[in-house]
Structures are given as structure tokens and as C-alpha cells.
Design a protein with these regions (language model features):
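Short hydrophobic transmembrane-like helices used for membrane targeting/insertion
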Residues: 1-3, 13
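N-terminal capping segments
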Residues: 20-102
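Residue-level marker of positions within ordered structural domains that often coincide
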Residues: 50, 74-75, 141, 154, ...
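...with weaker cross-activation on analogous glycine-rich loops/strands in unrelated enzymes
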Residues: 90-165
Length: 202
């Protein structure tokens, strides 16, 4: 189901939440799983696939910008950051960000976490379970995954040719997943977004 609500990034450069007033999931706190706005995530991906939102640093020259872009899309669809030190998922500026915001492996660990905290949550899934707004991660060589494209089109895909992605480093939109030469693929389905139970509706 696609939920139509104003995304925090839809019209460019909305200010980020203040971490001093951040929403952290504390052990025992009430968290509600709410729908992920897939349409907002995909619209953001299309808007910035070949550009750079000036509210975010461009990591192209220092390791790549793919997971930074993926996190921006996730934020567009979730509307909340997790300012938990070290293990959270947030961006304040180029130097103040969580490892999960820009790191392929760290983002995977964050999305599939068991720790209760606010923010998007996901699980590894099969190719046919991918939906627009989900992520795929690719391993080209070595033992670690190195790329985090965003799914912009998929409908019970039976092959990677039927999954289209947007990405940074290298910039792409509507690119068939089959066009990548990778050794391993993992698919991440976003199940929803954890919010404090008392927070206003998205």
C-alpha cells in the first residue's frame, strides 16, 4: 500500500531534525510500526538520481555516494532518523553521521536489527518480493558488499531484468539490475518504519 503523506525531502531541502530533540528507541519504550511511503522514496530517487541534494555531502570522491543516496531515499519514505550513537541511522553533516548512513554493510545491519529503535526496518527477501522503494546490495569482488541501489520498479520480478534501480556512483535511473556484473546479490525489503507510539501520524 502506498501512503500519500508529505515527505520531509520531497520539495528539496527541508531542515533536518535537531538531534538534541531526537527520537530514540529506548529499551522498553513503545514503538509503533507504520507504513513506509514507497512513492515518496521512489520520487526522491528519480529527482536526485543524476543530481545531488545540497543538504547532503557528496561522498563520490571518498569511497562512493551510493549508500548516502540510498539513505536519503529511505529518509524520504520514512521521515525519521535514529540518533542512537554509533548504532543509529542519521545525518547531520558530512562529519556527523552514523556509519549506517553511508556504509553498505552497516546499513544492512541497521535495517535488519533486532534492537528496538525508531527508523526504517527491513529484512532480506527473495527477488520476487522486492517492491519499489526497497534496496538491493551487490558484491562485485572480495568478501564484502559494495553497492546499494534503490529499487524504482519491480512487480513480482522473476528475473533481474525486471528490477529497475536508481543509484549514485555511478549515477543511474531505471537501470536494469541485470546490467550489473556482480558476484552476489542480496535483496532488502522495507517492512515499515518504527515511530514512538505517541508521535503524530505521518
Amino acid at each position: 500500500m502506498i501512503i500519500l503523506h508529505p515527505s520531509p525531502l520531497r520539495k528539496g531541502v527541508a531542515p533536518f531534525p535537531n538531534p538534541r530533540h531526537s527520537l530514540k528507541g529506548k529499551e522498553g519504550s513503545a514503538l509503533a510500526l507504520r507504513p513506509y511511503d514507497r512513492q515518496a522514496a521512489v520520487l526522491y530517487a528519480h529527482e536526485w538520481a543524476y543530481g545531488r541534494n545540497p543538504k547532503f555531502y557528496d561522498y563520490e570522491r571518498i569511497g562512493g555516494d551510493c549508500t548516502n543516496f540510498a539513505s536519503q531515499c529511505l529518509f524520504a519514505g520514512s521521515g525519521i532518523m535514529d540518533f542512537t550513537p554509533t548504532f543509529g541511522w542519521y545525518y547531520i553533516d558530512a562529519d556527523r553521521k552514523a556509519p549506517a548512513w553511508t556504509g553498505v554493510q552497516y546499513l544492512h545491519q541497521y535495517l535488519t536489527r533486532e534492537r528496538p529503535s525508531v527508523g526504517p526496518v527491513g529484512k532480506e527477501c527473495q527477488l520476487w518480493e522486492l517492491r519499489p522503494g526497497d534496496l538491493v546490495q551487490l558484491r562485485f569482488q572480495g568478501e564484502v558488499f559494495q553497492h546499494s541501489p534503490v529499487v524504482v520498479q519491480a512487480d513480482h520480478a522473476q528475473s533481474t531484468e525486471e528490477v529497475l534501480i536508481a543509484a549514485h556512483s555511478y549515477d543511474a535511473d531505471y537501470r536494469p539490475l541485470s546490467s550489473y556484473g556482480y558476484e552476489e546479490l542480496r535483496c532488502l525489503h522495507i517492512e515499515g518504519v518504527r515511530w514512538p507510539g505517541s508521535s503524530p501520524n505521518l
